[in-house]
From Swiss-Prot:
Alphabetically ordered keywords of this record: ATP synthesis, ATP-binding, CF(1), Hydrogen ion transport, Ion transport, Membrane, Nucleotide-binding, Plastid, Translocase, Transport
Reported function: Produces ATP from ADP in the presence of a proton gradient across the membrane. The catalytic sites are hosted primarily by the beta subunits.
A single cellular component GO annotation: proton-transporting ATP synthase complex
Membrane topology: Peripheral membrane protein
GO MF annotation: an example: ATP binding
Protein name in the entry: ATP synthase subunit beta, plastid
EC identifiers of the protein: 7.1.2.2
SMART domains per UniProt: AAA (SM00382)
This protein's encoding gene: atpB
Enzyme class: translocase
Self-association and partners: F-type ATPases have 2 components, CF(1) - the catalytic core - and CF(0) - the membrane proton channel. CF(1) has five subunits: alpha(3), beta(3), gamma(1), delta(1), epsilon(1). CF(0) has four main subunits: a(1), b(1), b'(1) and c(9-12).
Length: 490
């Protein structure tokens, strides 16, 4: 069990001192390599295939099994096209090692920590291996505290835990990317923190779109790259399963350095955690393991736990993780999402219905949940106000069928008042984002939690019943809503 923070530094020894073996079998992305007796590499060591004669291959593999007879089985992190039996393989003597620290900000990396954005080499003076122990119990910060994001609907109805794990659910086109970018922007401005984005097994186009939008919104500063607020690590769905299985660990290793050495608060995004499980399932089958339920790997819980347990708060800093969760065939009992749910502290569900109404962020206030929304953690006032808001919205939801058939006039006076307040609440949950300024022309707003609670209390108390509901749409705090109402009257 590791007690002291890890040491970071140049961890690769010179090539001359390394063990050399040769390929004896290739089955797709899996290689069997023979080494001299007594020179066997350790499990998880990185092996590099150098090619023959003048042919430079540079295919990196990771040792997964020791087979006996001085052979190991390794999984490739790159394409294995062009590899042949008999090619020389070098044991690096260490697991995959990636650059960490400030030089990673504003750059895009692959699973091996190599920059893939054509902006030249990255400073590799400070590096770290991707396989590490979770922090020891005595290092953990066990105090429950809210991680304020400045986004009203999140902080008020489904608050994030500092050092916690949040599941992000939502289909295409409901504002997932914009929400992620706003969180990256707000953690940098309000907490002096940084973010790491791990693209695990998703579309290359989506990764490119995210990068372009980040440049447009200023999250990545092209002119002064060190001013950027995020490092990007991609292992997209066209890559071998080994790369997709390990890219989450590469992103996490970069985040751990910011937490342990720079003592910062870090946001780690993983998109998509299901693809991490899927890649592990592919690798497991390639290695000949007996599949478990629904064809998943027998080590599913162990693999998920080894990733998730490293995401936590320590006395130095915190890693708060937001993980997009794909639910195959909408089956929440599928082993992949079911194993993920066991680790989550909160869920943020994006609703297509709210997005269609133009309410952004389109976070569903009734479906999103958080274990932090308890009176002993958030306080009585916050808890009571949140419950009243949810009750009002739930009643509005129940009345919508009656309104659609009979109209508002058929409702009782009390129900009409509930509907009016619920519509104001729904609009007040929307908010202009800093990263969307370039598209909307409206300046972004960061709203503190105390301001948010005050605003909802005023709506629930009936003090603002006379204001039109459009005054509450896309504003920051409640004072802006009253000001907007005055402007609408004039």
């Amino acid at each position: 069990m590791r007690i002291n923070p890890p040491t970071y530094g140049s961890e690769i020894s010179s090539i001359e001192k390394k063990n050399r073996g040769c390929i004896v079998q290739i089955i797709g992305p899996v290689l069997d390599v023979a080494f001299p007796p007594g020179k066997m590499p350790n499990i998880y060591n990185a092996l590099v295939v150098k090619g023959r004669d003048t042919e430079q291959m540079n295919v990196t593999c990771e040792v997964q099994q020791l087979l006996g007879n001085n052979r190991v089985r390794a999984v490739a992190m790159n394409d294995t096209d062009g590899l042949m039996r008999g090619m020389e393989v070098i044991d690096t003597g260490t697991p995959i090692t990636v650059p960490v620290g400030g030089s990673t900000l504003g750059r895009i990396f692959n699973v091996l920590g190599e920059p893939v954005d054509n902006f030249g080499p990255v400073d590799t003076n400070t590096t770290s291996t991707i396989h590490r122990s979770a922090p020891a119990f005595i290092q953990l910060d066990t105090k429950l505290s809210i991680f304020e994001t400045g986004i009203k609907v999140v902080d008020f109805l489904a608050p994030y835990r500092r050092g916690g794990k949040i599941g992000l659910f939502g289909g295409a086109g409901v504002g997932k990317t914009v929400l992620i970018m706003e969180l990256i922007n707000n953690i940098a401005k309000a907490h002096g923190g940084v973010s790491v984005f791990g693209g695990v097994g998703e579309r290359t186009r989506e990764g490119n779109d995210l990068y372009m939008e980040m440049k447009e919104s200023g999250v990545i500063n092209e002119n002064n790259i060190t001013e950027s607020k995020v490092a990007l690590v991609y292992g997209q769905m066209n890559e071998p399963p080994g790369a997709r299985m390990r890219v989450g660990l590469t992103a996490l290793t970069m985040a751990e350095y910011f937490r342990d050495v720079n003592e910062q608060d870090v946001l780690l995004f993983i998109d998509n955690i299901f693809r991490f499980v899927q890649a592990g399932s592919e690798v497991s089958a390639l290695l000949g393991r007996m599949p478990s339920a629904v064809g998943y790997q027998p080590t599913l819980s162990t693999e998920m736990g080894s990733l998730q347990e490293r995401i936590t708060s320590t006395k130095e800093g915190s890693i708060t993780s937001i993980q997009a969760v794909y639910v195959p065939a909408d089956d929440l009992t599928d082993p992949a999402p079911a194993t993920t749910f066991a680790h989550l502290d909160a869920t943020t569900v994006l609703s297509r219905g709210l997005a269609a109404k133009g309410i952004y962020p389109a976070v569903d206030p009734l479906d999103s949940t958080s274990m932090m929304l308890q009176p002993r953690i958030v306080g009585e006032e916050h808890y009571e106000t949140a419950q009243k808001v949810k009750q009002t919205l739930q009643r509005y939801k129940e009345l919508q069928d009656i309104i659609a058939i009979l109209g508002l006039d058929e409702l009782s006076e009390e129900d009409r008042l509930t509907v009016a307040r619920a519509r104001k609440i729904e609009r007040f949950l929307s908010q202009p984002f800093f990263v969307a300024e370039v598209f909307t022309g409206s300046p972004g707003k960061y709203v503190g939690l105390a301001e948010t609670i005050r605003g909802f209390n005023l709506i629930l108390s009936g003090e603002l019943d006379s204001l039109p509901e459009q005054a509450f749409y896309l504003v920051g705090n409640i004072d802006e809503a009253t000001e907007k109402a005055m402007n609408l009257k004039t």
